[in-house]
Amino acid sequence: MSERSLPALDRDLPLSVAAALVAAFALLSGPVGFALTLLHPQPAWTDAATFVAHAHPIQQLPYWLGFGLLGSCLLLVARVVALSWEHNRTRALVVLLLTAMYAAAILVNYALQVAYVPVLARAGSPLVAYVTMANPEAPTWLLEMFGYGALGGATWAAAPLFGAHRPWIRRLLVANGVVSIAGAITCAGGMGWLQTVPGLFAYLAWNALFIAAAIAIAVDLRPRRTPRAAARTLLHTRA
């Protein structure tokens, strides 16, 4: 990176802060959000009428928190791309495009969950079966799984940008990519497994990998008292 760009980088968001936000929102929108919905749980999916009878606003909480996860992921990827653009432009662009695909799919899905599902539920419409993620066969699950599959592709592609001296970050990002893409591919054969015990274990495994990767980035790349030139070589390894 040129010396001329350094003052702007000094004022920019630290990579560690963006990663910490990702970890926090992944935890809140995932395990914590899921636990809170148990205060007013939905029974196992049977039909739209049963869903409407048990609908409650708290069931939307994980999706509202999911917007925070979406935004923090965009911040993290934007920072990674900015730091690696000069030396790894092609790989950085691939990461950026895959993340944009993730953001588009998840934004549409979560908007449907927090804005359209309540409207359909209040109206008692049977169309809610085609939108709510309480139904494991709803097409919105494809947006979810393929959206996070795209994000997994982005983390996989981004792994080499962290250099050979950060092997655990690289491994966690690659593992997250493998799990995310495998989940998306599996959905091509049917989505009924998503709300079974194997689906729950897959969900917990993804969250564990994703949160661990974000925490590793936040800890390893936290601001230190280093010379300016050294501090700007975080992502200089060519992929």
Language-model segments: which ranges?
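Hydrophobic, aromatic-enriched alpha-helical segments typical of multi-pass transmembrane helices
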Residues: 2-239
